Amino acid sequence: MFATSIAGSLPKPAWLAETHKLWPQWKAEGDALLQAKADATLLWIKAQEDAGLDIVCDGEQARQHFVHGFLEQVEGIDFQNKVTMGIRNNRYDAMVPQVVAPLRLKGRVHAFEAQLARAHTKKKLKFTLPGPMPIVDRVADRFYGDKVKMPFPFAELFYQEAPALEAGGGDIIQFDVPAFHVSIQDASERG
């Protein structure tokens, strides 16, 4: 028998964030935002349980964007001076943060989501992390100078966060590479 789960994120409620935008803005700040993220997460956990899914997730409700939600907790990323860059193999342009220094985690990236979700479900719990390929596709490199080498420091950060998610109650860690099909050549060059 196959275990059932969703793939990817779930839509954010209109009361949490703008809808139908690549990088939606939050509709609250401070403690009110934390509570809104928690409320949205709990609603989606309940919906997945009610649907009978075997494995539930946080729906990525606390992340503005699946890549940038990770990068917000990484030292060496400049969000203040975004630049325009072609992403998804130059399919479209986006304003992206820049890598400007060696990369280090500021602390746990998704501890809030892991603790909240684990406390509210007895089902198996899955967390999604972006893979290195989608990250390097969505940041401008102003430090490493080599797109082939740049994924490796990000991979080291995942080796820190993934076991921490597991220790925090995550049963499954999914590395998500949604635009792999537009980066086949990059994948073969980078391994």
What residues fall within each predicted segment?
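Domain-level signal for soluble alpha/beta catalytic cores
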Residues: 1-191
